Regions:
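N-terminal Rossmann NAD(P)H-binding glycine-rich loop of SDR-like oxidoreductase domains
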Residues: 3-23
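SDR active-site strand-loop-helix element
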Residues: 6, 29, 64-68, 106-111
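Conserved glycine-rich Rossmann-like NAD(P)H-binding loop of the short-chain dehydrogenase/reductase
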Residues: 25-32
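Short loop/helix-cap segments at secondary-structure boundaries that form the rim of catalytic
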Residues: 32-40
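NAD(P)H-binding glycine-rich loop region in Rossmannoid oxidoreductase-like domains
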Residues: 45-86, 97-100
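Short alpha-helix in the Rossmann-fold core of NAD(P)-dependent oxidoreductases
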Residues: 84-91, 107, 139-140
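Conserved Rossmann-fold NAD(P)-dependent oxidoreductase catalytic core, especially the SDR/UDP-sugar
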Residues: 93-135, 155
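Active-site Tyr-X1-5-Lys
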Residues: 133-159
Length: 159
């Protein structure tokens, strides 16, 4: 499979490359584009902008794994808008790119912070009503909602 991985130079992306490189052709999409062992090519974010780099110049992808994002800032030094620009805005761009592409699979890594800031009891379950606290969690749930709003539901399943 040809797989495009966003955030390929981050912690999860770097480890995912190690796990997938033997069986798949991996491409990266990141804010930096140095060569990386196991990756055919890494593109910059601007490369998926149709006006500056038409999609016909990109390889065809079978799947897109979206890991890129702005991590929560435990020291609270980041401006709130930067979370929305990156976590929500870039997710919108990459999901729209996916919808226009030939890829059949899209995997989005969000965050537990999209659902809750803390867990009452032993675990957080899927039936929790999202109540994010702060711009990090709010930007992640906004990205999730954007994707869900774009999807079709058929016979109770997301398509």
């Amino acid at each position: 499979m040809n797989i495009l991985v966003t955030g390929i130079h981050g912690f999860v992306g770097s480890n995912l490359v190690v796990a997938l490189k033997e069986r798949h052709s991996l491409y990266g999409l990141d804010i930096v584009a140095p060569e990386k062992e196991g990756v055919v090519k890494t593109f910059f974010w601007k490369d998926i902008e149709p006006a500056s780099f038409p999609m016909r110049n990109l390889p065809e992808f079978d799947a897109i794994i979206h890991l890129a994002g702005k991590a929560h800032d435990t020291k609270n030094r980041s401006a709130a808008q930067s979370y929305f620009d990156i976590n929500t805005g870039l997710t919108q761009k990459i999901f729209d790119f996916f919808l226009e592409s030939s890829a059949k699979k899209f995997v989005f890594f969000s965050s537990v912070k999209a659902a809750a800031d803390s867990v009452v009891g032993d675990m957080l379950t899927e039936d929790v009503v999202p109540a994010p606290v702060g711009p990090y969690g709010e930007s992640k749930i906004a990205a999730e909602n954007y994707i869900l709003d774009k999807l079709k539901v058929e016979n109770g399943k997301l398509k």
